[in-house]
Amino acid sequence: QNFMAVILRDVVKVAIIDGDTKELVNIVDTGFAVHIVRYSASGRYLYTIGRDGKATIVDLWMKKPDTVAEVKTCYDARSIDSSKYKGPKGDFLDKYAIVGCYWPPHMVILDGNTLEPLKIISTSSYTYDTNEFVREARVASIVASHHDPEWVVNIKEAGQIWLVDYSNIRAPKIAMIEAERFLHDGGWDASKRYFLVAANFRDTISIVDTKEKKLVANVKVGRIPHPGRGANIDHPKYGPIWCTGHLGDNTIQCIGTDPVKHPQYAWKVVVKAEMPGEGGGTLFIKTHPKSPHIWVDRPLNNDPKLQRSLFVFDKNTFKLKAQIEIPEKYAGRAVHVEYNRNGDEVWVSIWGKKNEPQKQAILIYDDKTLKLKHEITGDWVATPTGHFNVYNTMKDIY
């Protein structure tokens, strides 16, 4: 459960690395330009989705983990997840998977073990505010609930968050919640009851209560928020908060997420911290319950120095502790920070050109000392981008 799956974006592969030994376990073929990796609830299966709509499943419990099935779900896709619920309503662990497509705009429910397509549901819909029909209402992010047999599916152009009940896929129930338009990435709060998602071109975070199945709030944040799945912190003053970075400005902003014990801070921006330099460019922000830090990347900033830097904040004071520049021998941008299972290491990809693998690497930093402790290199390390720890991803720890 400390394996790390690393997307090798432009060579159409995913590398599986042992997070303890740092040794390469296998490299598997995938769809084109894999967007994300997700794991089944048991941790046995690794799911990938390419931007070409090809989904693959890797069995991590094989002696040498490898691809066991693939399916073409559409022509353009971004999201995939599995069923994670086990409780009074049934045992759905590893039973289903779901893919969200850009084109055609639909979601596809799959058998979680074989990827056999079971149900296709169109997401063409109406905009929640102007009531205009949108044929290309694309599926952005998808997350799986731990408390109910349902997926949270974000319909980008319509501004709707769909709660898709998979307890009976022959007659699925869908709660369509009006939120805000141009929904993109998002993640759970610490309780996994509330889902927070960026409506990035509206500079808004939409928050849904998945228990009550209703919109809680639309909270204005900075310019073009891009949280990935965000970062959850138990703050000494504000209680549980969830944080995002931004593509359009240099701030980290955090929203209170505890309406019971900290109602005065709930659904408000309670922290606004600034990073050095002009502009944003942040794609990912990450922390871990065992870590005192927040790590932030800025690969899409216009300044080459900031593209190649990582920013580390104290998660209680939100003071900048370090701006870490990657070694000069590597040519590329620092992208996607990810903790190991124990929360004492931070992995980051150095994303460069496809034909220059010798100038790219996966760097591993000690979260306590903030020093570089390991460099993973080789001819196979070509265009590394996202990397996903098995345990943290299947448990939604971020």
How would you describe each model-predicted region?
Residues Q1-Y398:
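Predominantly soluble domains enriched in secretory-pathway, periplasmic, or organellar proteins
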